[in-house]
């Protein structure tokens, strides 16, 4: 596997942070290459936060660049070694740049918190708008249906028991009749103390561009 595809990197330099933070990320990356370790065994900088991502048969680490305050929940901005950027809000993708398919200007409504959604009997319907590149498709409106599902028996989840998490499935409410319809998204949520944190997700940006992500190291 190409070492450039499996090193983690990023942060302060690209996110406008201090030089020392950026140096720390690069030093970690250089050490990782030198040791030739796989991602799952890599010694990570404890001062940084990571996502373990699988995409197109590759496993990569993304580093948290910064947090963007938002009335509907903090947006986490994550970077890869290839300068790909993924934005997550409450576990949902609200931006992706640098991949073969890109989402921009994603708008979400104010959504119930995950514990409340977990207690729902009926599927929860909601709408999202997004701009998609390439193709210059602006203002695509998706009507989605979210419901709980049994823990997945097969997934890219590592280091956690699927049965300890609450699982959700998110489908296009029109059963895929829309030209913009995408494969099903899934979320694994850790619920404790009345709070819910998405620790694992499966998302497609297009029918051909799908990835999984997990907060890493597992359980941190």
What kind of region is each of these model predictions?
Residues 7-10, 107, 159:
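Acidic/proline-rich low-complexity IDRs
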Residues 9-12, 120:
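Processing junctions and N-termini across compartments
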Residues 14-17:
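C-terminal motif of bacterial Sec signal peptides marking the signal peptidase cleavage site
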Residues 106-118:
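Surface-exposed beta-loop interaction hotspot
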């Amino acid at each position: 596997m190409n070492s450039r595809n499996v090193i983690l990197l990023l942060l302060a330099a690209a996110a406008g942070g201090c030089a020392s933070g950026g140096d720390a990320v690069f030093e970690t990356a250089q050490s990782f290459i030198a040791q030739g370790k796989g991602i799952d065994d890599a010694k990570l900088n404890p001062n940084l936060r990571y996502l373990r991502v699988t995409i197109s048969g590759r496993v990569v680490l993304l580093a948290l660049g910064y947090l963007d305050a938002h009335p509907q929940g903090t947006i986490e901005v994550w970077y890869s070694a290839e300068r790909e950027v993924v934005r997550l809000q409450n576990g949902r993708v609200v931006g992706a740049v640098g991949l073969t398919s890109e989402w921009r200007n994603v708008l979400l409504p104010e959504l119930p918190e995950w514990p409340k959604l977990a207690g729902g009997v009926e599927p929860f319907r909601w709408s999202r708008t997004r701009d998609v590149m390439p193709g210059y498709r602006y203002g695509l409106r998706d009507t989605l249906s979210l419901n709980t599902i049994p823990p997945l028996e097969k997934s890219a989840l590592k280091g956690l028991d699927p049965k300890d998490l609450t699982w959700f499935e998110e489908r296009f409410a029109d059963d895929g009749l829309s030209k913009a319809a995408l494969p099903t998204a899934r979320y694994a949520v850790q619920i404790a103390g009345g709070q819910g944190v998405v620790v694992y997700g499966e998302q497609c940006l297009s029918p051909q561009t799908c990835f999984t992500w997990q907060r890493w190291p597992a359980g941190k």
